[in-house]
Amino acid sequence: MKAVGNADLLIRVGENMETWSAKLFDKSTGAGEYLDIASEMGLRLAAHEHENEHGHEDEHEHEHEYEEGFVDAHIWTDPVYAQGMVKVITDALCRLDSRNAEFYKSNSEKYISKLQSLDAGFKDAVRNGKRDIIVFSGRFAFRNFTERYSLKFVSALDACADNSEPGARTVAKIIDTVKNENIPVIFYEELTEPRTAEIICGETGCSMRLFHSCHNVSRDEFESGVGYLSLMNDNLQNLREALS
């Protein structure tokens, strides 16, 4: 809390993403400026799903629809939304530190250019792919991503915050989907043991690849200096394989 109180700028994606941040965003913390990225972008975030304690017995394909006007809270998984996030943060930095505004703007332009290239890469992968469906063996944080690139998806669990294990019937249905659609690759999430993916691969002969949500990184990843762009470019290569 002391660090928060001494901060010139306190940033969050949105209240419905970092539900724990409400107290930190109370003006009594004394931080200099408060930046709610989603609000500044004019986005209304859907409530972040809570953990489910029970195993799931249905795979999820476009099952959960948000209230009209709301978007999934994981906005950074969409490279176009990510560009908006960079612009909002840059504007805040320029207000706080106008002396270095040109420095921030220059770096922002360079980074946004890289995000635009990333977006173009995903569009190319989808345009040249043999299929338009991807399969996730665990939790799912890519609704904005799949909507941006007009991809269908099947996921074993319907929420990123869901820590339950998919049930046997769910796994069996996904195995059938992989076989029927000739899916070459299924995805698993970072920082988890891909047990479900291993089962599906064992039954179908498909490969499994990491599709990183860029939500958290391991200590090794952090120490190696990975960032959003490197993780998403890895996702791009894995997506090309999955759509081949």
Stretch-by-stretch model annotation:
Residues 1-244:
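Extracytoplasmic metal-acquisition and chelation regions
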